[in-house]
C-alpha cells in the first residue's frame, strides 16, 4: 500500500477507520483529509464493533484495526483513546467510554462526566490528560503495524463549559488555551488535540509503508 499526499490531484489513499463513534468520525475525517487520506468508516462496510478486552490502549487499538482489516480486506486504522487522571490512578483510562456504566450507572457522556466530577470532589489535584494511540495495519496479520501516540494535557473543572466536542470535553480545561476542549471550535481542537498529535506522528511514518 502506498500513500501519496503530494498534490490534491494525486490518487488518494483509502483506508478503513475502525470506529462508528460519530464524534471520532468527524474529527478523523478532518484530520486524515489534511494528510491526503480518504477514510471509510467501518459501519459503511457492514463491519461490527470489535471487542476491547485489553487493559492497555495500544492492545485495544490493534485489536480494532485488525478486526476491521480482516472483515474488509483493506488497510485499517484504529484509535483507542481516553481520559487519564493521575489522582485516580489513571482512571477512567481505557474504560473512559463506560466509566459510569462500570459503577452501575447508565452509559452516556453525561453520566460519565457526572461520575468523574463526583470522584474528584475531595481531590485537590485536578491534572488530567487525554491520551490517544493510533494503530495502522496494511493487512489483518501485519507483523509491523504503525503505532503512534499523542497526549494532551489539561485539568478537570467541575462545571461543564462549551457546546462543541464530545465525551469529557466540557470538563477538560486546557490552561495553555484558556478554554475547555468543548469551547474550542473543531478546527482549533483538531490542531491541538491528542488525536491531532497522534496523527501527525503517524503521518510522519507513512513512508515506512510499502
Swiss-Prot record:
Cofactor binding, note field: Binds 1 Mg(2+) ion per subunit.
Endpoints of the signal sequence: none
UniProt EC number: 3.6.1.66
GO cellular component: cytosol
Cofactor(s) needed for function: Mg(2+)
Annotated Mg(2+) binding sites: 51, 80
Binding of substrate, residues: 19-24, 81, 166-169, 189, 194-195
Protein name: dITP/XTP pyrophosphatase
